[in-house]
């Protein structure tokens, strides 16, 4: 009887540990690291938005604050 209780306890502990690890990535904790990896892996260094838009973004400082502009104005923001 004691062996069965111990086995159930160990299995529950393993389940809790696995669930806790998985939950950390779902909350977006690693979002910034993933974005940096994506920026580094892209081959083409182009601006997807019009040149005027990207220049305004750089002047306004949105290259540092906005992921949207950081990805779509890579060349103007100096990320590649």
Curated annotation (Swiss-Prot):
Positions of the UniProt region annotated as Crucial for binding to potassium channels: 68-69
Broad class of the protein's primary localization: secreted
Cellular component aspect of the GO annotation: extracellular region; nematocyst
Pro-piece positions: 21-39
Subcellular location: Secreted; Nematocyst
Residues annotated as domain ShKT: 45-80
UniProt keyword list: Disulfide bond, Ion channel impairing toxin, Nematocyst, Neurotoxin, Potassium channel impairing toxin, Secreted, Signal, Toxin, Voltage-gated potassium channel impairing toxin
Disulfide partners: 45-80, 54-73, 63-77
InterPro entries per UniProt: ShKT_dom
Signal peptide: 1-20
GO MF entries: potassium channel regulator activity; toxin activity
PROSITE patterns: SHKT
Function of the molecule: Inhibits voltage-gated potassium channels (Kv1/KCNA).
Homology family: Belongs to the sea anemone type 1 potassium channel toxin family. Type 1b subfamily.
Record protein name field: U-actitoxin-Avd9a
Species name: Anemonia viridis (Snakelocks anemone)
């Amino acid at each position: 009887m004691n062996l069965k209780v111990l086995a159930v306890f160990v299995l529950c502990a393993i389940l809790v540990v696995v669930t806790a690890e998985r939950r950390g990535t779902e909350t977006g904790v690693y979002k910034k690291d993933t974005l940096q990896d994506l920026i580094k892996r892209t081959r083409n260094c182009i601006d997807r938005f019009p040149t005027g838009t990207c220049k305004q973004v750089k002047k306004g400082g949105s290259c540092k604050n906005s992921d949207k502009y950081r990805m779509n104005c890579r060349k103007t923001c100096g990320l590649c």
